[in-house]
């Protein structure tokens, strides 16, 4: 019985083609032909997709990968279909990448679809998209069926159009939840054929009596017996007009008593709803028995395929340590404020008064001849002017007046005062001296200093005269015998002439010389 059913399916599906192609189309259309996919282990979850989702998946099937046009793996020796994993990969990719967002609306279903795709890739591995296939001709090739050779001499063929459609339908059936499917229900509205909007102008309260159509009255000139066939069968309400024809005047009068005030309504739309329901059913045996019929072999072969589908869940925990460093740059704005307040007030007042009293001078007697001469010379000391001349008798005290200036600076708060003293000098009148040597600046010395200075000058003068006299003595007139008389310093034997007297190298000091400087000039230590 199964063999007969298989043969009928081959004839109807292949359209008169070879027996091999027909049998292979049945196997390729089954998703369970792929060893890494088992539809029984997947719980259906799609329920929010439209019914034409399969058309979208078929339309974008060939655009997913380069191998989608030749995705069926074939045995090189027996020319049997080994698996359709690549075809199933193309269908899942078309559903996930190209059609789901346009035909489905649930985010939870999309997340479940991602899990199915990931599990399929883990089980079957990553399919190679860059594999180069070369065409290969054989006796099974035809205009619709082509074979290709890939790496390691693997043989592939293209899926036929009905094989691809059946594979997509079987895949969506295994993923669709039939109990919650609402994608097959389409609701639409049927609008009036003429697309006209009709208004309700006047009608009676009972709604049974309808007024004649306005267009009908205009076309028939008030003939009430004629009806326009194009308005039959439609529910339309038109504005009622007064009829001027005589044939309708009686009926109008009879109906005038039963009519009441007419109302105006909003426009109405007439819609109709059609519901189409489609149910999908499938038979899923636990074991699949596939019969392959090949012309070269007369004996049938029974192949039992065990499909395994593994679910692997991997949890990965990643610890991340974030180290950040922050650099801050501060700008310092120095602020310097200097407050200077100076207040100086100086007041200086000095008054100096100098009074010179009359100094009595006496004549000193100095012995100029150490050998006993009786010649004496008198020296008078008095007060003289700065130029060495005697002061005039009429010269009295001369006052000197000096101004006092005051300098004031308001900004520095400093006040200075400069004082110039006023000095009154008075020189007494002294008698005029006739002889003697005069020494200037004696008016600045008191009595004791003056006497000490005079004695010092006298002693120094005598010593210098003694040395000078000793050095000027000539010994050429005396002999050795006269050596006893060398110590004889009697006055009778020594005579002094004017050549033995000469002036000392002592300069006359000016007015205002100090005592130390005067002693230095005189040679007194």
From Swiss-Prot:
Keyword Nucleotide-binding: no
Segments crossing the lipid bilayer: 449-469
The entry's keywords: Membrane, Signal, Transmembrane, Transmembrane helix
Gene Ontology CC terms, in alphabetical order: membrane; mitochondrion
Signal sequence, start to end: 1-21
Subcellular location: Membrane
Spans within the Cytoplasmic topological domain: 470-525
Regions of this protein lying in the Extracellular compartment: 22-448
Positions of region (Disordered): 242-264
Topological relation to the membrane, as annotated: Single-pass type I membrane protein
UniProt-recorded name of the protein: Uncharacterized protein YKR005C
